[in-house]
Amino acid sequence: MRIAFVTDPLGGLDPSIDTSVGLMHAAAGRGAEVWVTQAHLLEAVHGRARALARRMRLAPSRPAGDHRWTVAKRWYTVTEPRHVWLDEMSAVFMRTEPPVDQAYVTATLILDLIDPARTPVINDPRGLRACSEHLLGLRFPDL
């Protein structure tokens, strides 16, 4: 099983509480290869979604209470980047934070090229464009 995560730069994630890191640990704990990339590293090639990605290995972690984890200072290692076809992954997680910019929108359009019957994309790119959690509040200015 190979799972790709489209995330923000790893150095900006807080591994003690970040849910993307928690999902990576859960995947690795179940024997999956964890691959990481960023939105601007996705591309469409001959109608397929491809990413420049790195295989990630996570240092062990353990629960610390208050929904946090105790992690090593060097909480991951990664391989050299290589091109991978995202439709050959077992699943792809879209896990980036704002801004919702051109790279983000383009990444969701590229992820649309993946057949969800073959490779699930979590969070659905169409849903992210139609109802982004980062922009949804703008629809309710009175709140």
Predicted regions and their residues:
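Conserved N-proximal alpha/beta basic substrate-recognition cap immediately N-terminal to
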Residues: 11-143
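Extreme N-terminal starter segment of soluble prokaryotic enzymes
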Residues: 1-4
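Extended, domain-scale alpha-helical bundle/helix-rich regions
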Residues: 7-8
